[in-house]
Amino acid sequence: MQCSGASHATPGAPYFTEFVEGRRGEILDAALAVFATKGYECGTMREIAAELGVTEPALYRHYAGKEALFADLLGAAGDQVVLRASAVIDALDPARVRESLLGLISARRTHVPHDDSTKPVMQMLFTAAPRNGAFREVIRGHLAGPMLERLRAFIPRADAYYGIVRSPEETTASLRIFMSLLVGYVITGMMLDVPDDDEGVADAMVAIMGWDATAA
């Protein structure tokens, strides 16, 4: 395994201790710091223990190994994203669909930093997680699945308001496009040094779904 290409960016402020209580939050923050700078493949339990200020055997009393620790990190992060997004998604209003979607898009700024400290973390998530079936299941169970279910509940309400009839297959296909645009915009906003265009993305989402506000 080659680790020469691992990132050496400086991690940002503690993240998990803001919402995960006790020692678990401290361990997850230590793991995040190591994985952000070394990558998942190159980061070690020994380095995480050193970051935390404990011995490696002490860390193993909390987690069976690096995979279990990383899976818990993914799950905790996913749960927090869903918790923060749920209120916004559940409040989406078909009668004000563009404004509601714009609020959903812009809400990310409250919770996602837009600076270089985010890049190594996102690189870690999108390189290590997709190659591991267990990690993919964690992401589905804690992030993708709950988000999809909430949006799946909104789409029929919006469709009914605008007089759109879709088959179950069409709804699933539309939901995938909708999520691809939303998630892709958020991720590229964190990874690329390009200006935001919330208005344009909201317009594109409305157009893709066929929710013409003038129809109301």
What are the language-model segments listed below?
Residues 104-108, 122-126, 178-182, 205, ...:
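Short alpha-helical scaffolding segments that buttress acidic/His motifs in well-ordered protein cores
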